[in-house]
Amino acid sequence: MSDSKEVPSLPFLRHLLEELDSHEDSLLLFLCHDAAPGCTTVTQALCSLSQQRKLTLAALVEMLYVLQRMDLLKSRFGLSKEGAEQLLGTSFLTRYRKLMVCVGEELDSSELRALRLFACNLNPSLSTALSESSRFVELVLALENVGLVSPSSVSVLADMLRTLRRLDLCQQLVEYEQQEQARYRYCYAASPSLPVRTLRRGHGASEHEQLCMPVQESSDSPELLRTPVQESSSDSPEQTT
């Protein structure tokens, strides 16, 4: 592969997109959401990122790695899985978006249907935003739009997965949020001129090199949706000084 910081040409991008199906297109659009907001197609998003010079070869490699398209990494970039892993964490992609894609790929259709029902119970307005064909990443975006999920607060999704008995996925989200809170506190502790605060919903995500981190299961989390409105409102900790 040539320079990893090189911005690929538009013809190269078009040929690459021809190799992807509609599901993979939706995942790429989700991965690009923070850096290319407002784009409704993956082509628009990639063109926007190319104009911003954020769409480097390393970013494309990381996207394809998240999609598990090792065949394209080999044929288009001449990279093995191990070679691609050397470039992870060097692009604009956030751990939050990558983790959501990983979680969604582990869910079957019945679990996704249940998650959509849980979401509509939490916020009835989501019934108009979601359909039977809505993918997991589209569910995540809908939850973001109503303030139930953000890069710094994924406890609502974790509770939903706990109800489905998908403790493996639930614990990945719990571990992620704990790490984000610890990172936020560390950044403020290292900056005496800034007030120390607990992490609040809506703050931006930070980048990590890991994709989906294995974690240990925990049994100390509350059950989901006994009182969904109250539980979702308690996810945002009080500001401290």
Curated annotation (Swiss-Prot):
InterPro entries: DEATH-like_dom_sf, DED_dom. Residues 8-78, 95-175 form the DED domain. One of its GO terms (biological process) is symbiont-mediated suppression of host NF-kappaB cascade. The keyword Cell membrane does not apply. GO terms for cellular component: host cell cytoplasm; host cell nucleus. Residues 229-241 have a biased composition (Polar residues). It comes from the Viruses. SMART domains: DED. Associates with the death-inducing signaling complex (DISC) formed by TNFRSF6/FAS, FADD and CASP8. Interacts with FADD. Interacts with host TRAF2. Interacts with host NEMO/IKBKG (via N-terminus). Interacts with host SH3BP4; this interaction plays an important in the suppression of host autophagy. Inhibits TNFRSF1A, TNFRSF6/FAS and TNFRSF12 induced apoptosis. Directs the degradation of host NFKBIB but not NFKBIA. Also suppresses host NF-kappa-B activation by interacting with and preventing ubiquitination of host NEMO/IKBKG, the NF-kappa-B essential modulator subunit of the IKK complex. Interferes with host CASP8/caspase-8 recruitment and activation at the death-inducing signaling complex (DISC). May lead to higher virus production and contribute to virus persistence and oncogenicity. Also participates in the inhibition of host autophagy by interacting with host SH3BP4. This is Viral CASP8 and FADD-like apoptosis regulator. It comes from Molluscum contagiosum virus subtype 1.
